[in-house]
Each structure stands twice: as structure tokens, then as C-alpha cells.
């Protein structure tokens, strides 16, 4: 089965064609990072306008790279949320119109759920059950994936997502946008044990990064106010170590508690080198298999949406054309 995926939830316009949920035939991404860099973050109005300009071109390129036409496609999947509403509407409307015109089944995909499926692209033989940590700029979710389209969300952030904390600390330290890669890079030159930052105890498998973010900002502000010398590299490294330790510890604990000895990480923060190395290390210590997507599939892309769409269509799930963009939506537990 060939599925066309479309992703426009934030500032990447992407289209991909995936075969049987795991084999990528094309994956085209138009990134707006250079446009939004000067503003220190994504400007929603600009993002949606750029999606309108590029969506047709990106979809055409996906077909050209795959050597296919729309007549070869068996279904269409598109992100419906969460994300920026203007951006979401561009890809969702395009997908629904194309589906209607060509009488192809259409399926709306939750962006958070889509990130999970980046692992099934990188590891074609990977199968559930597994523990999944989805960690990105807007979301931090800990999930038990029991089967395709059957999962339990056992933990989520109570406030800021991990990626959001990275972006805000990077902005405060003057490291620019996007913040995650900037902190990852500069932290390599710092002493991660220089500062000890507090971690909020929210119990269970939930997360909280707002207090940590405030503690780092207040600490740096105090150093500046007192005129004390310090290295931004040390702050970045210490902050990063704290975030990573929280994410790794809770994910490992869930794996041990459930005796599901497979862990997969997904989302933009999955590209963080410290997070990847710590997971490899801790999983090896506990005899747990670890999976993480290739770097190019950690950030937003349509291949993961097409993959997720395939598994939905295989289960007979088809969306209505009344499905609308939903900018604020969580991932909720689902039984098949």
C-alpha cells in the first residue's frame, strides 16, 4: 500500500510517499528555519503563508522523487493537530481536497502519534510492544505502545515540554533559534557537573520542566547581577544533563516496571546527542533494547505521518472530510 503523507503543523512543509508503512520512496521537506531565525522563534502568520506558497511544489517533488503519480497512491494522511492552526489548515485542506478529487481514503493523524512511527521507518523489523518517549518542543509523553493503534499514555508534562524548556533557556542565554541544537552544541564545551539544578517531584511518570527553567534563569540572572564570572557553556551543560536525567530515569523505570524491554524515543529532542548517549548507556546496563530514529526523522517530516496513516488504514480507520485542524490536542490512550 502506498500512502501520501502531508505535514504542515509548524514551520516545515513536508510531503512523503511511504510503502507499507516502513519503506520511504520520497520525503521532501521545505524548512523555514532561516526565515524565522531573525525573529528568535516561529511567527505563525509567516509560517502559514509560506506553507501556502510551497505545498503544491513540495507534493509535486515527492511524486517526482518516488517516480510515481497520484494514480499510484492508495491513501492520503495529513496532520490535523496539534500545531499552529494556520499552518495545519494548509496541509489538511490540501490533503482533503486531493483525497476528494481522486476518491482516495483520507486519514487525519495526530502529530504526536506520528512521531512514534519514525521508529518503524528507521527499524523496519521493529514491532510492539514497546515503551515510547515522545519528546519535542511542544510535548513530552511517555507511552506504552501495546500494538499498532493501541497504546496507553502513562505520563506527560504538567507544564513546559522538554523542548520548550530548551528553547527558552537558549533564548535567555542568547544562543538563538532553534534552541535545542544550540544548547546541545555549546554544552559539549561545558562542565555538566558545575551546577546542580532542582528537579520538581510531580510523582509517577509525569514531567515538569517549568520550575527547572525558572531556576536556571534565576541563577544566571543572579550571577549577572552580582557581576560574577561564569561560562554559558557550563550552564547549558548542567541544564541539559538535568533534563536528560529526568527523561531517561522515568523511561527506564517504566520499562523495568512493565517488563517491556524495548524503548523507543521520538520527536525533535530525540536528536539531542546527550539524550541519545545516555539512553544507549542506561539501556545497555539494564539489558533493554533501544531505538531512536535517524536524525532526519526526529524533526517534523511527512514520512512519519504517512507511516502512521498506513497502519490506521490497515485497521480500517478512515477520517471524515469534516475533520478540522485542532491546534491544542493531547495524545490520549487508545484501544483497538
From Swiss-Prot:
Cofactor(s) for this protein? Fe(2+)
Q: Which family does it belong to?
A: Belongs to the KAE1 / TsaD family.
| Enzyme category, top tier | transferase
Protein biosynthesis keyword on record: no
GO CC terms, sorted? cytoplasm
**What is this protein identified as?**
tRNA N6-adenosine threonylcarbamoyltransferase
Q: Name one GO biological process term.
A: tRNA threonylcarbamoyladenosine modification
Q: Report any Pfam family annotated for this entry.
A: TsaD
Principal cellular location given in the protein's record: cytoplasm
Listed InterPro entries: ATPase_NBD, Gcp-like_dom, KAE1/TsaD, TsaD
List the subcellular locations: Cytoplasm
Q: What is its EC number?
A: 2.3.1.234
What is this protein for, i.e. what is its function? Required for the formation of a threonylcarbamoyl group on adenosine at position 37 (t(6)A37) in tRNAs that read codons beginning with adenine. Is involved in the transfer of the threonylcarbamoyl moiety of threonylcarbamoyl-AMP (TC-AMP) to the N6 group of A37, together with TsaE and TsaB. TsaD likely plays a direct catalytic role in this reaction.
Q: Which residues bind Fe cation?
A: 111, 115, 300
Co-factor remark: Binds 1 Fe(2+) ion per subunit.
